[in-house]
């Protein structure tokens, strides 16, 4: 995510210098070959050594999937939405203006598996956003993953 000036928002940098706590819930419902995976998590952020506290964050997602299984592999195409809600940052106990926001993304991807291995990829494109009073713009995201079941 970039400021319109081209610099990167500090809220999205690696490491906040604080201890943060994650509360998460995940639920999958499946009927025959169709399913829905839902997820919500809340990140409780604490103040760092510079008396700066990034705002708490809520993330959520709902992903529909279809499970196709053949004798050689499994294929699971996915389609859904994901969202993020950012509370305001604070410094020395004072709210930092224009640091809250929200983002809603569309999500498409797949997983392909064989034996204990699976490979997946997904892309996310913003549907609507209001980040840092419009000063930050989220662009597309993509990821790939490789898993091994123990």
What spans do the regions from the language model cover?
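Outer-membrane pore/translocation modules
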Residues: 1-53
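Outer membrane beta-barrel transmembrane domains
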Residues: 49-150
């Amino acid at each position: 995510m970039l400021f319109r000036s081209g610099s990167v928002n500090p809220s999205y940098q690696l490491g906040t210098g604080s201890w943060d706590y994650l509360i998460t819930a995940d639920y999958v419902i499946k009927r025959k070959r169709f399913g829905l995976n839902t997820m919500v998590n809340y990140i409780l952020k604490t103040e760092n050594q510079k008396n700066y506290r990034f705002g708490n964050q809520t993330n959520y997602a709902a992903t529909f999937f279809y499970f196709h299984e053949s004798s050689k592999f499994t294929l699971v195409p996915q389609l859904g939405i994901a969202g993020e809600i950012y509370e305001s940052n604070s410094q020395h106990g004072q709210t930092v203006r224009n640091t809250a926001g929200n983002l809603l993304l569309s999500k498409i991807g797949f997983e392909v598996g064989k034996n204990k291995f699976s490979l997946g990829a997904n892309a996310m494109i913003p549907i609507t956003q209001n980040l840092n009073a419009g000063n930050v713009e989220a662009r597309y995201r993509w990821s790939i993953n490789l898993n091994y079941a123990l």
